[in-house]
A protein has these predicted regions:
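Helical element adjacent to the flavin cofactor pocket in flavoenzyme catalytic cores
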Residues: 190-254
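Glycine-rich active-site loop/strand segments that organize a redox cofactor
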Residues: 39-62, 130-134
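Mobile amphipathic helical/loop "lid" adjacent to a hydrophobic cofactor/ligand pocket
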Residues: 67-73, 77-193
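Glycine-rich FAD pyrophosphate-binding loop
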Residues: 22-47
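N-terminal Rossmann-like FAD-binding beta1-loop-alpha1 element of flavoenzymes
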Residues: 3-30
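Mid-domain catalytic core of redox enzymes
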Residues: 236-346, 350-357, 361, 370-374, ...
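Conserved flavin/dinucleotide-binding core of flavoenzymes
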Residues: 99, 314, 324-457
């Protein structure tokens, strides 16, 4: 009889753990507290225009090797596409953004789109200092914010507005004035290493031509159905049961215990408290999770009666108002898309503290004013679907760099998974799936499985 693993949480880290453990012969049971799988990456219905959209458009990079291994496993990797992106200025001009190693060279030579001539030499010198320090990723950077780091290397405000503040917002989902500098340095160090190994293509950016449920969830559900695995929805786990130094099951909210030979706890940082009460060392995990507070992202699936006039599938908006960070053009992303019920654009705003509580009407009015300044056309709104993810990601403030816990616990058959655990990445989809890879590897090793799962890079 196959060994049984119970996975608490059906987000990306839980799904990847389930699929890979299933591949190596485990009997899998998933406990998901919501009514659907996918966690913080899921599709949303927009019945007003008869469309299926997402709860927030994501950018993916070729360096996301663990995420793409998961897509291969569930049969959806062929939905990924990679193509150039651009930067859109307030004056309506748009500039192609260099990708891979080219983006770093563009910055080093002060050739940022829209950068005033007077700031080019300053930007070059600042970038030399910035990327040199990023490559080292000194833990001392955890004592200062990203904004302070920019000031120390002499980064001009113009360069920050055009690229560097958007960089921090995009990868950390936090304001430069609040985010620790170390996670940004660590991610850039990882990026540079992977770019060298990948011939400069590791940080080419891409998107999928299907919704999140189709991309991440449906293929996994097919696997679970074909292999007889169980998925329990609206299943609230209360505590992992430990006996004689091993996990033996999961106690549910109704008092029932689901037996297990192993447990993967794949919940967000803010949901872990209570689950590990019987686990030695749980206080340190709870303390770590308390430091990794959540940050919001506001996304708008915008349907217009005509095209904006985008030139790239993704255009970053260089604007100090921080009302829109990115504009995704679904007509470019999905050639031949039926526009009879509206031209669809996805707008995203990271670390959206300022606009998160705005009424929808105020938000859309402000965003449309900005779009009309930046784009050649001025279409009208057909419908706007606003999605507020209050707990979109965790955020790392100064002093939290060493807080993220390992996937391995003091219980050999219990592992943690989730983007908030220790990985090479900050709070990203790749971080979530890499955590699953690490968790599965740790579990297989501790259980001395005869056929260990192939782990990602």
């Amino acid at each position: 009889m196959n060994q049984k693993v119970v996975i608490i949480g059906g987000g990306l880290s839980g799904l990847a753990s389930a699929v890979w453990l299933s591949e190596s012969g485990w009997d899998v049971t998933i406990l998901e507290r919501r009514a659907a799988l996918g966690g913080r990456t899921h599709a949303v219905s927009v019945p007003q225009v008869g469309d299926i959209a997402d709860n927030g458009q994501h950018i993916m990079a070729r360096a996301f090797v663990n995420l793409f291994r998961y897509l291969d496993a569930v049969g959806t990797m062929d939905h990924m596409h990679f193509s150039p992106i651009g930067s859109r200025m307030r004056d309506g001009s748009v500039h192609p953004t260099k990708q891979g190693m080219g983006s770093q060279l563009q910055m080093l030579f002060g050739a940022l789109p829209g950068l005033p001539r007077r700031d080019r030499l300053k930007t070059t010198l600042a970038c030399l200092r910035f990327f040199t320090q990023a490559a080292r990723a000194d833990i001392a950077l955890d004592k200062i914010t990203v904004a302070e780091w920019y000031r120390r290397v002499g980064m001009p405000d113009s360069a920050r507005e055009i690229v560097f503040d958007l960089l921090a917002l995009g990868v950390l989902n936090e304001l430069p004035e609040l985010a620790s500098a170390y996670p940004l340095a660590s991610l850039l160090s990882t990026a540079m290493k992977k770019s060298v190994r990948g011939g400069g293509s590791a940080f080419e950016f891409g998107y999928s031509d299907v919704d999140f449920d189709t991309l991440y969830v449906n293929g996994a559900q097919r696997i679970f159905s074909e292999r007889g695995h169980q998925v329990h929805y609206r299943a609230i786990a209360r505590q992992i049961e430990i006996r004689n130094g091993r996990a033996v099951g999961v106690r549910m909210a109704d008092g029932d215990i689901i037996d297990a030979d192993a447990v993967v706890c794949a919940v967000p940082a803010w949901n872990v408290r209570g689950l590990l009460d019987q686990v030695p060392g749980h206080d340190s995990v709870y303390a770590a999770s308390a430091k990794l507070i959540s940050a919001p992202i506001v996304s708008v699936n915008l349907y217009l009666d005509g095209p904006l006039g985008s030139e790239f599938w993704l255009e970053n908006i260089a604007s100090p108002e921080h009302i829109i960070d990115n504009v995704f053009d679904h007509q470019i992303m999905h050639p031949g898309r039926d526009t009879g019920r509206g031209f669809r654009y996805a707008l995203t705003t990271s670390a959206a503290y300022m606009i998160n509580d705005w009424p929808n009407e105020r938000l859309i009015d402000a965003q449309m004013r900005l779009l009309r300044q930046c784009y050649p056309n001025s279409p009208h709104v057909v419908h706007a679907n606003v999605v507020r993810e209050n707990n979109a990601t965790f955020t790392q403030r100064p002093g939290t760099a060493l807080s993220r816990p390992s996937q391995q616990t003091q219980i050999p058959n219990l592992v943690l998974a989730g983007d908030w655990t220790k990985t090479e990445w900050c709070s990203t989809m790749e971080g979530a799936v890499q955590s699953a890879s690490f968790a599965v590897s740790a579990l297989q090793s501790s259980m001395s499985a005869s056929s260990p799962v192939h782990v990602g890079i």
